[in-house]
């Protein structure tokens, strides 16, 4: 089977420009440096805080888990350098946008780069010693004669956030990555993942990944798409990502 993930160079340059923002770069660097519980806590702050006011009143942010709030309090009391660097850059990023719905929408585009970059760099790290494994981002999908650029309209979605293919093992993975899963009007993204899995005869595992807990992701999906079969898509929440 022939599988490849041609990169959308224009889209990649756009993402990399946002990734070069000093605040984004610092936040991603800290997330990549953390594992397990620390990663869970840092990622949860990114997930559940979407405006400057949230960062100014972390104990009052309703959806942040209590154990994360306790961790924040401890890190603040200990004056942990990594935590203060993370918070400084995250606050700088958030406060750089007008605190209106329009500003939060623009900020959301920058926030969305954070989990996508995390997954991409984790995959690059995982397969660094295996040159036969190709890891791409902002990429189209080609499976034998099927090409997402010609077989799907732009409105349906033609790209995945991250694509991985091992030509020797004939196995791969694709990831659609979100900060939180709010795709009420984007069922086509789920269908795209299912099509990839089907056309590859299940040789490409498909993932919907988020910084939100898996149970929250599933609650959202079931609320948005009642009765929809979700069994073809692997759901990864913050717990799964911290062990990626």
Predicted regions and their residues:
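Intrinsically disordered, low-complexity Ser/Thr/Pro/Gly-rich regulatory segments
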Residues: 1-244
């Amino acid at each position: 089977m022939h599988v490849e993930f041609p990169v959308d160079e224009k889209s990649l340059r756009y993402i990399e420009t946002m990734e070069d923002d000093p605040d984004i770069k610092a936040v991603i660097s800290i997330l990549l440096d953390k594992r397990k519980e620390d990663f869970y806590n840092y990622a949860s702050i990114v997930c559940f805080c979407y405006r400057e006011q949230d960062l100014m009143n972390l104990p009052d942010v309703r959806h942040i888990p209590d154990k994360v709030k306790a961790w924040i309090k401890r890190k603040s009391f200990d004056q942990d350098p990594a935590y203060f660097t993370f918070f400084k850059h995250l606050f700088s990023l958030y406060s750089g946008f007008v605190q209106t719905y329009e500003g939060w929408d623009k900020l959301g585009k920058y926030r969305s780069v954070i989990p996508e970059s995390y997954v991409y760099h984790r995959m690059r790290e995982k397969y660094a010693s295996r040159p036969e494994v190709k890891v791409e981002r902002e990429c189209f999908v080609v499976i034998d004669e099927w090409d997402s650029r010609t077989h799907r309209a732009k409105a349906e979605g033609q790209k995945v956030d991250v694509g991985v293919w091992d030509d020797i093992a004939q196995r791969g993975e694709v990831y659609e990555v979100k900060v939180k899963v709010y795709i009420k009007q984007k069922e086509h993204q789920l269908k795209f993942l299912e099509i990839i899995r089907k056309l590859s005869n299940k040789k490409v595992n498909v993932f919907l990944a988020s910084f939100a807990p898996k149970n929250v992701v599933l609650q959202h999906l079931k609320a948005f798409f009642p009765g929809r079969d979700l069994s073809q898509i692997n759901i990864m929440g913050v717990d799964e990502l911290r062990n990626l």
